[in-house]
Curated annotation (Swiss-Prot):
An annotated GO BP: iron-sulfur cluster assembly
Function: Chaperone involved in the maturation of iron-sulfur cluster-containing proteins. Has a low intrinsic ATPase activity which is markedly stimulated by HscB.
Protein family according to the UniProt entry: Belongs to the heat shock protein 70 family.
MF GO annotations: ATP binding; ATP hydrolysis activity; ATP-dependent protein folding chaperone; unfolded protein binding
Protein name: Chaperone protein HscA homolog
Matching InterPro entries: ATPase_NBD, Heat_shock_70_CS, HSP70_C_sf, HSP70_peptide-bd_sf, Hsp_70_fam, ISC_FeS_clus_asmbl_HscA
PANTHER family: HEAT SHOCK PROTEIN 70KDA
Pfam families xrefs: HSP70
Originating species: Verminephrobacter eiseniae (strain EF01-2)
Keywords from the named record: ATP-binding, Chaperone, Nucleotide-binding
Length: 622
């Protein structure tokens, strides 16, 4: 009979050794899988020793497919069926896809998900979720082959600026790939985990993450194993692909050529990427591509490349400045800058970062691998495998404020941007009209004061509110955001217990323009927004005062003399005329005048109510 081996708690030499947990960096250009082995986080190679898996999937007729390296070459001669950079399409609608006309794909509406896009291939229409699932499945297989065991779970990284739709699409892709998802974490946060544990870093750090398709900047406070993201920013339509596209446009202009077919565009993109990478090591490199029976050959100087892409680098640095402003920090307070993403190898990027912060960026770890390495450490912890990672505390934040619409089209923020997640916040609201039995709740996202300037996330209704006078009901609205950044909203009437709930799963993501514009607009229009909000609030208060006074007159008007009633009605007429004025102070003055003019009436009503409540009662019964 086999004997059980018993160890002291936490002292087993190989606790949970069969829990194979990995970190996956699902990237725009390349994807990686990493795991902690023998206490060290490392990327897992394929059979040929390659750790980078090109994020490319080629669909064949009869249901076949090629994934990764074997699909890369087909981008030139089978561009329509060879899908690259699919991460840029996750959670997006057709109208959200920038430069769709320049891409070699046939975009069609997704029949299964209203508002979403799919890509037409020889194997049928494929959604970005399905394409991403192919890449994830290949990485899962690599991990299981490496350990010769089934996968327990994975932590998958996403850009910090991914919204709810894009995060949900990533979770769906993991499920489709057969991967038990332990958690989604932000890519910059994963990089901080890797650097923090490897170097025992403490203090304020910036993580500058320029990948193939997205740019993220995160400001983090690292102290004694606690990773707190205190500000985030970025651009979901800025990455290495955009540098490639700018180079292609410039080369075609120099060569006086045009890309007339999808195969031409694919060949030019591949040549641009190779030229860009060469220019990181040399001052001049050849751009060479065969298109439409002609060869395009241009010698590109690094200075030329930096000039034509200067605006892209400047866009990233503008986001860095905004993130520091959000964190209420100066660049001098940042102890170090971590570079993430293969695009950060470009000299102009490293130079811009160094000049801005006044110090060279950290490059201890491979920028292509650092995100996967950090995700693997987090997965190791979540799987219960112990080690130093067991003491790690991770605090991500939400990138944009969340709130609800109130009267007058104003936004009442419930969860402020840069709030650490997971979190739950609640706020009490009330009814606006007498006898109101339902409340429409409109959930919005953004930094502006007016609903029309923010992004609508969801709408739902709370019904079954007992009829009562305006302002008597107490409705608690709760926002709960899980560790993956996904939102659920509930509303409950405190007296009756009536409640409603919704999981916010928007049908499409933010457009490229919206993401770049939302924060910029909030700063540029702050003063005007404040003035507009004050005006709307004054009008709402005036309307509420008029409605309450009208109800009081209808219920207890006989308590007033004709002269008193006429005085109140005159004040009401003045307020009614002034409430459409464009000056909040004028409206507030008229509202206050009516409030003062009805004080005696309100006191009489209160006294009558008390007398009626006490009628027939004595001290003992009270």
């Amino acid at each position: 009979m086999a004997l059980l081996q018993i160890s002291e708690p936490g002292q087993s030499p190989h606790p949970h050794q069969r829990r194979i947990a990995v970190g996956i960096d699902l990237g725009t250009t390349h994807s990686l899988v990493a795991a902690v082995r023998n206490g060290v986080s490392e990327c897992l190679p394929d059979a040929q020793g390659r750790v980078l898996l090109p994020s490319v999937v080629r669909y064949l007729d009869q249901g076949g497919r090629q994934i990764g390296h074997e699909a890369v070459a087909a981008q030139v001669w089978d561009a329509r069926n060879t899908i690259a950079s699919v991460k840029r399409f996750m959670g997006r609608s057709l109208k959200d896809v920038a430069r769709a006309g320049q891409l070699p794909y046939d975009f069609v509406p997704d029949a299964a998900a209203q508002g979403m896009l799919s890509l037409a291939t020889v194997a049928g229409n494929k959604s970005p979720v399905e394409v991403s699932a192919e890449i994830l499945a290949a990485l899962r297989q690599r991990a299981e082959d490496s350990f010769n065991a089934d996968l327990y779970g994975a932590v998958i990284t996403v850009p910090a600026y991914f919204d709810d739709a894009q995060r949900q699409a990533t979770k769906d892709a993991a499920r489709l790939a057969g991967i038990p998802l332990l958690r989604l974490i932000n890519e910059p946060t994963a990089a901080a985990i890797a650097y923090g544990l490897d170097n025992a870093s403490e203090g304020i750090y910036a993580v500058y993450d320029l990948g193939g398709g997205t740019f993220d900047i995160s400001i983090l406070r690292l102290a004694q194993g606690v990773f707190e993201v205190i500000a985030t920013g970025g651009d979901s339509a800025l990455g290495g692909d955009d540098y490639d596209a700018a180079l292609v446009d410039w080369v075609l202009q120099q060569a006086r050529r045009q890309a007339s077919t999808p195969a031409d565009r694919a060949a030019l993109r591949i040549a641009a990427r190779a030229c860009k990478q060469a220019l990181s090591a040399t001052d001049i490199a050849a751009f060479s591509a065969d298109i439409s029976c002609a060869n395009v050959h241009v010698d590109v100087r690094r200075a030329d490349f930096e000039a034509i892409t200067a605006d892209l680098t400047a866009r990233s640095m503008a986001a860095v400045r905004r993130a520091l402003r959000d964190a209420q920090l100066t660049r001098d307070q940042v102890q170090g800058v971590v570079l993430v993403g293969g695009a950060t190898r470009m000299p102009q990027v490293q130079r811009a970062v160094a000049q801005f912060f006044g110090q060279p960026p950290l490059t201890n770890l491979n920028p292509d691998e650092v995100v996967a390495l950090g995700a693997a450490i987090q997965a190791h912890q979540l799987a219960g495998n112990g080690g130093n990672a067991a003491e790690l505390l991770l605090l991500d934040v939400i990138p944009l404020s969340l709130g609800v619409e109130t009267m007058g089209g104003l936004v009442e923020r419930i969860v402020a941007r840069n709030e650490p997640i997971p979190t739950a916040k609640a706020q009490d609201f009330t009814t606006y009209k007498d006898g109101q039995t339902a409340l429409a709740i409109h959930v919005v996202q953004g930094e502006r004061d007016l609903v029309q300037d923010c992004r609508s996330l969801a709408r739902f209704e709370l019904r079954g509110i007992p009829p009562m006078v305006a302002g008597a009901a107490r409705i608690r609205v709760t926002f709960a955001i899980d560790a993956d950044g996904l939102l659920s909203v509930s509303a409950k009437e405190q007296g009756s217990g009536a409640q409603a709930h919704i999981d916010v799963k928007p049908s499409y993501g933010l457009s490229d323009e919206q993401i770049a514009r939302m924060l910029q607009d909030s700063f540029a229009t702050a003063a005007q927004d404040m003035k507009t909000r004050a005006l709307v609030e004054a009008r709402v208060d005036a309307e509420r005062m008029l409605s309450a006074t009208q109800s009081a007159l209808a219920a207890d008007g006989e308590m007033l003399s004709a002269r008193e009633r006429a005085a109140i009605e005159a004040l009401m007429a003045t307020l009614s005329a002034q409430r459409e004025a464009d000056d909040a102070a004028v409206i507030e003055a008229a509202t206050e005048a009516l409030a003062q003019g009805t004080q005696a009436f309100a006191a009489r009503r209160m006294n009558r109510g008390i007398r009626q409540a006490l009628a027939g009662r004595n001290v003992q019964t009270l």
